[in-house]
Each structure stands twice: as structure tokens, then as C-alpha cells.
């Protein structure tokens, strides 16, 4: 288009001024043709900029390249152990602005993003260890798992002996111009696997080192379409905040007993549970909401039988029809199995739980009392209590059975409902415990948690009361018993309120690192809501007394062995 050429005013040096249409200048609110000063480095302002580091300089006299684009910043850390075999995947991360602390914050202001990300790896081996890792960029759509030869993709090799950081760029492979901030869609994945075993040539007790991950955006990284401050997009949630330090250090309870969590119980044989257990889709196969309320109310019914006198209390938990979650059983109905007993052979360490109900004698626990207080599926009138073997046919009635021997020389008889996760021990001072997850009542279709290599399911152990033990704790007169739950209750509540399905895929763990005074370990959460630890065949309960803090690590393939590097963290209790 023809038009009049703009005449440069006299005295205006070339390059020191430009029209507002030039990219990189401030144009908002300017009329066409308004002159805007650009960043021009002269001998006068260059020395000033260096001396003041560009702080407080006049507008647009500071270098436009912000430090968050030029500097590497800490993003993550993972552990490399001598036990990791060649091919073991130690670290994976999908391309996202969340991989850098500054782009993660800025992404909240924009509707989309595009561009690559640079990753820098620093091995904390001080040049002593031998071994190599390979970092590879895997294109979108390729499944990451055992057998994947990552060296067939663009990669770099990281030598443990090298003291220099190693950098690799993750390009942005995308079918569209930009990624939406909430759902990035198909993106590449960065994978680090073992090339050669880690070797400590001097031996000793050190068997692992840490690799620090730092990031910065590539030169082509950019955001697009700023959002209004009042607007809000649908962002994919992350499970990182589900498991925190307070949950496992005092305020957290388990989802079966609602008692304070004191340890982690590995279950190498696997387990399956559904009641108050929720998955990452925000759904459950169970029948109870993640809340505990008083469900025992005395009805005062007595059932005489010769010299035996039993008193029964029945649960007042509503009916299955009134349960909005599931009509298998009333909300809050436990997943306990039955132990029917008739005659005098009643366990002398019968169970007391869910509110610590005991038979008192002048205000103190009656040591001659034999009692069992749990709930189970039962049918029939109070005079003819029978356990229900299935949930079809006759109506399921929730019964809280609390049998009490009202005479010192009398033998109680009747249906005792014992906890499946706890064994009633023969002596009052026994402090042994064996989990029995195979006796937990489950609904049809409930997924099971099976071991994945050395990664085995874990349950969260809590101290619960025993018969006549008012203040049950470690070392109490009646010993210590432990109940186990599949999740901390705060995690159960979080899963029930949100949908984390976009954050994790089948075959992945979301991993947290637990730091102890004597070492560290990792635990992972899968899509079914089960937690795992890399404890192998060990059944030793892990005491959480020395736990210092918990740090989220991120997604990782479930085939990658979770790090277990603890020493002396299981002292203080006796277990079997």
C-alpha cells in the first residue's frame, strides 16, 4: 500500500525510536504512530545496568530476557541405588509448565502454552561412584514400561563419575499450535533409566546417591492469551497434596479403625479392600462414606440360656436402603468377618473397639468380662442371630453384638464378631499381631492390590483398644494391638471429593519420599487407591516415630522399584 513516508525528526538517532507497531514495544493504549522507546544499550546505560543489576532502572532499559528464562532452578530429586538393575526406570516426567517453579506460577495467568523445556541433571556422587544413566525423550503415544529400549530415542548419557551437569532438551511435540493450560493432551515424556549398574568401589555402607533435576524453559517456550484475573480454567488436579507430613506424624488416622497411624505394614501377599476405600476416579466399591460416627446404641435386649446370660447391643446405623453410596449395607457398617462361638471356649481377649466400650465394675474395667464388640452381616431376630453368608435373599440387618458375661462363674455363648484385621491373642500381655487382609469383606468387582516386583502393597497401622484396656498404647498392661487400613483417612476424604484420573494412568505410581532420621523411603499410590513400598518380601512393620517430613516426587512407572533405604526405623515394638 502506498502512502506518505514518515520523516524522522531532526536529532532522533536511528534505532532509538520506533513506532508502536514494532513487536516487543509497549503498544496498549497508544494511538497509531505514537513513538515508543525501545531498549537500546549505550555506553552510558550499560555500565549503570551492570552496576545496579538492572534494579530500579528506567522503564525498558533492563534486558528483556528475564532470569527465569536463563537460569536453571531446582525441580526434583530422585535416588539411584546399587540395587537398580540395567534398564530400571528411575525417573519419568511428562512435558508441562509444572516442571519449572516459575512457569508453573505463570501458567495460571494464561490459557495456553507452547515450547520446549531444558532439564539439567547433577549427580551427587563426588566422582567416587561408577555407573551410567541414560536420559531419553520419548515421543507421545509410546507406552513406557519394561522392555522399552530408551537408547533408540534421542538421549544423553549421564556418567556418575562426572562432576559436570548434563543437560537435555525436551522438545514440544504437539499436533496443535498450543496446549491448553488445564489439559495439555499428547506430550513427550522424559525417561531416565539405568545404563550400567551403580558401583561404589570403596564398599562401605553407602548404597545409593541422589540425582538433582533442574529445569528452565527453552528459547521457544511461550504463553498465549492472558486470562482475566477473575476467570478460572478447569485444571487437572494432582494428588501431590494428599499425603502430607502431618497425616503420618500425629493428626492422621486410618480409614478402617479411625485411630492414629503409627506405622506402615507391608503385605507381600497382596490385599483387597473396599469399605471406605476410594480410587483416583473419585469412586468406591464400598458402602461407607469417609466419616466415622457413633453407631452403637444400647437396646438392652437380654438372651438367657441356662446359667449363661448375654446382653446384646444393636447398631443404630440406619438401613442399607437409606445409604446413598451403596445398598449393600448401612453407611458406616464395618468390613469385619465372623467368628461364631458356642459354649465356654470364648477368647479371653475378645475385642473392644469403635468407641472403647467395656463392661465396668465400680467404674473400672471388669477383668472377668469376656466381650466382643464389632459389627458384621447378620440376619434373624435377636433370639436367633445368624451370620449372613451373602447379600442376596433376606434383608441384611446391621448388628452390633456385644456379649457380656454378667457372672464371674458363668460362660457366655453366642455369636462373637471379631475383627478380620486383628487376631485376638491368648494372653493379656501379648504384643504380637498378624494382619489378615484376606478375611476382609469385599463387594463384588473390588480390585486387588498385587505385588509388582519388589513393590508390595502396604497398609497403615494404628493402635486400637483391647478388652478392658482403657488407655491402650505401646507398652500398656494389656499389650498393644494394631488395626490396619488401606488409606489414611485424610487421603480417603481427598479422593472422595476430587477426580485425579487425569494425573495418573494404569501402570503408574504417584510417588512420595518419606525422610526419616535414619534414612529415607518412597511410597507410591496407584489408580486403584492402593499404596506400595519397595520392601520386597519383608513383613516388618515400619515405625513412623522417626519420620521427619514427606515430599511429593511425581508419577513413575510401577515397574520401577520404590527406594527403601532405612536403618533402625522399626525399633520400639514387637511384631510377627
Swiss-Prot record:
It is found in: Virion; Host cytoplasm. It holds the Pfam family Calici_coat. Transmembrane segments: none annotated. SUPFAM superfamilies: Positive stranded ssRNA viruses. InterPro entries: Calicivirus_coat (IPR004005), Rhv-like (IPR033703), Viral_coat (IPR029053). Homodimerizes, then multimerizes. Binds to histo-blood group antigens at surface of target cells. Two different RNAs lead the expression of the capsid protein. One arises from the cleavage of the polyprotein translated from the genomic RNA and the other from the translation of a subgenomic RNA derived from the (-)RNA template. Capsid protein expressed from the subgenomic mRNA is produced in much larger amounts than the cleaved one. This is Subgenomic capsid protein VP60.
Amino acid at each position: 500500500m502506498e502512502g506518505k513516508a514518515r520523516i524522522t525528526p531532526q536529532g532522533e538517532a536511528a534505532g532509538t525510536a520506533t513506532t508502536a507497531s514494532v513487536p516487543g514495544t509497549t503498544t496498549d493504549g497508544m494511538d497509531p504512530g505514537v513513538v515508543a522507546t525501545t531498549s537500546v544499550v549505550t555506553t552510558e546505560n550499560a555500565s549503570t545496568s551492570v552496576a545496579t543489576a538492572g534494579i530500579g532502572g528506567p522503564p525498558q532499559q533492563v534486558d528483556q530476557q528475564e532470569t527465569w528464562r536463563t537460569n536453571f532452578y531446582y525441580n526434583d530429586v530422585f535416588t539411584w541405588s546399587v540395587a537398580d538393575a540395567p534398564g530400571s526406570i528411575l525417573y519419568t516426567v511428562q512435558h508441562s509448565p509444572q516442571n519449572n517453579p516459575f512457569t508453573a506460577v505463570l501458567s495460571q495467568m494464561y490459557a495456553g502454552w507452547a515450547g520446549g523445556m531444558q532439564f539439567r541433571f547433577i549427580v551427587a556422587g563426588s566422582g567416587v561412584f561408577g555407573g551410567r544413566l541414560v536420559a531419553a525423550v520419548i515421543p507421545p503415544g509410546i507406552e513406557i514400561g519394561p522392555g522399552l529400549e530408551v537408547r533408540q530415542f534421542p538421549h544423553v548419557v549421564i556418567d556418575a563419575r562426572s562432576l559436570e551437569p548434563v543437560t537435555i532438551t525436551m522438545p514440544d511435540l504437539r499436533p496443535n499450535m498450543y496446549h491448553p493450560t488445564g489439559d495439555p493432551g499428547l506430550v513427550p515424556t522424559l525417561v531416565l533409566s539405568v545404563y550400567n549398574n551403580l558401583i561404589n568401589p570403596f564398599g562401605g555402607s553407602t548404597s545409593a546417591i541422589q540425582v538433582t533435576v533442574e529445569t528452565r524453559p527453552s528459547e521457544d517456550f511461550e504463553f498465549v492469551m492472558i486470562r482475566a484475573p477473575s476467570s478460572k480454567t478447569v485444571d487437572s488436579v494432582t494428588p501431590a497434596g494428599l499425603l502430607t507430613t502431618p497425616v503420618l506424624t500425629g493428626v492422621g488416622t486410618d480409614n478402617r479403625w479411625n485411630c492414629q497411624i503409627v506405622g506402615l505394614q507391608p503385605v507381600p501377599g497382596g490385599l483387597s479392600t473396599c469399605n471406605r476405600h476410594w480410587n483416583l476416579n473419585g469412586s468406591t466399591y464400598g458402602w461407607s462414606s469417609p466419616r466415622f460416627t457413633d453407631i452403637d446404641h444400647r437396646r438392652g435386649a437380654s438372651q438367657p440360656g441356662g446359667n449363661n446370660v448375654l446382653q446384646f447391643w444393636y447398631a443404630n446405623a440406619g438401613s442399607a436402603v437409606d445409604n446413598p453410596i451403596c445398598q449393600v449395607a448401612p453407611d458406616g457398617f464395618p468390613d469385619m468377618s465372623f467368628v461364631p462361638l458356642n459354649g465356654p471356649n470364648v477368647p479371653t481377649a475378645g475385642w473392644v473397639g469403635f468407641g472403647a466400650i467395656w463392661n465396668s465394675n465400680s467404674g473400672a474395667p471388669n477383668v472377668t468380662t469376656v466381650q466382643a464388640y464389632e459389627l458384621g452381616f447378620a440376619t434373624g431376630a435377636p433370639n436367633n442371630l445368624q451370620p449372613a453368608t451373602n447379600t442376596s435373599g433376606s434383608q441384611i440387618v446391621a448388628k452390633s453384638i456385644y456379649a457380656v458375661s454378667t457372672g464371674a462363674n458363668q460362660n457366655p455363648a453366642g455369636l462373637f464378631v471379631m475383627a478380620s484385621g486383628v487376631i485376638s491373642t491368648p494372653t493379656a500381655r501379648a504384643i504380637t499381631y498378624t494382619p489378615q487382609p484376606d478375611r476382609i469383606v469385599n463387594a463384588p468387582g473390588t480390585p486387588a492390590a498385587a505385588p509388582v516386583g519388589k513393590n508390595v502393597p502396604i497398609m497403615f497401622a494404628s493402635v486400637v483398644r483391647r478388652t478392658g484396656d482403657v488407655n491402650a498404647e505401646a507398652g500398656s498392661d494389656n499389650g498393644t494391638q494394631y488395626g490396619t487400613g488401606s488409606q489414611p483417612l485424610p487421603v480417603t476424604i481427598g479422593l472422595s471429593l476430587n477426580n485425579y484420573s487425569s494425573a495418573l494412568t494404569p501402570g503408574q505410581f504417584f510417588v512420595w519420599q518419606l525422610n526419616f532420621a535414619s534414612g529415607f523411603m518412597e511410597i507410591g499410590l496407584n489408580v486403584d487407591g492402593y499404596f506400595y513400598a519397595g520392601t520386597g518380601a519383608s513383613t516388618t512393620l515400619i515405625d513412623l516415630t522417626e519420620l521427619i517430613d514427606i515430599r511429593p516426587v511425581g508419577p513413575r512407572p510401577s515397574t520401577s522399584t520404590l527406594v527403601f533405604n532405612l536403618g533402625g526405623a522399626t525399633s520400639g515394638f514387637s511384631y510377627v
